[in-house]
């Protein structure tokens, strides 16, 4: 593999050549993200979610998302790059202050090591990086996880399925990563602004999902992550979680990040109690498309929507490292 393929580039908003549509089933090695890629129409679904119904209910009293204290994020509609109410669009953001590197399909230990390399660089003033990656099937245990408590199968069964388990330093409980899930590791300076940073991550995902045609995406007060409208199944209402979030802060810089279910095999979430939440079901963009008659989604569409949303959400972010004493750390306790 050419060494240049692993190097990040400045996140520019100029139009790049249009690559062919790429589905979740077709992967390449680590590659630079091409913005304004063509909207792939190759089907991304894996047959999950048959027969579910969605009532279109939206719980009242949800707070408006903010990208800073007191600053409301513009409401978005499914049309890409168009903000309602005259809000700023991605084309107005000349250059983001972070790099974007697409690592393709990469085993979890290698991605974990890459995060730490990027952290060491950012901690001494290097340019922040957003790592995009998919993982082979794997379970990770956050700081809240008790050994095996929310894993509902034996380690022997997981080993037979080729699913590894790793204890990591992020906040939260157990979660699943696998093909069809877009994982974004935001190696950004944070310091003590952990809660504000988590809200910004949520806002970026909400904006991306709005661009993809899911305007009901929203945070869930009291829990980290992003949800769509709940569904009633067999007389019980279940929250529908589409994106998990869990971070750690070391040397004032964030590790880990988000896992957005694009066209994930949702059956694998049956191996665990996701994030330890018994009244929550995991969903995906493709499942929501199936239920709403929206066709199919590609991983490239999701990457484009998410990176555009990050550029907008973090356009006014304070990228300086806060004045925290050397060697001091803060670890978040975010639900994955």
Curated annotation (Swiss-Prot):
The record marks 241 as: Lowers pKa of active site Cys. InterPro entries: aa-tRNA-synth_II/BPL/LPL, BPL_LPL_catalytic, Octanoyltransferase, Octanoyltransferase_CS. GO terms for molecular function: lipoyl(octanoyl) transferase activity. Residues 1-22, 48-88 are annotated as: Disordered. It comes from the Bacteria. The active site is at residue 275. In the C-terminal section; belongs to the LipB family. PANTHER family: LIPOYLTRANSFERASE 2, MITOCHONDRIAL-RELATED, OCTANOYLTRANSFERASE. In the reaction, the free carboxyl group of octanoic acid is attached via an amide linkage to the epsilon-amino group of a specific lysine residue of lipoyl domains of lipoate-dependent enzymes. This is Octanoyltransferase.
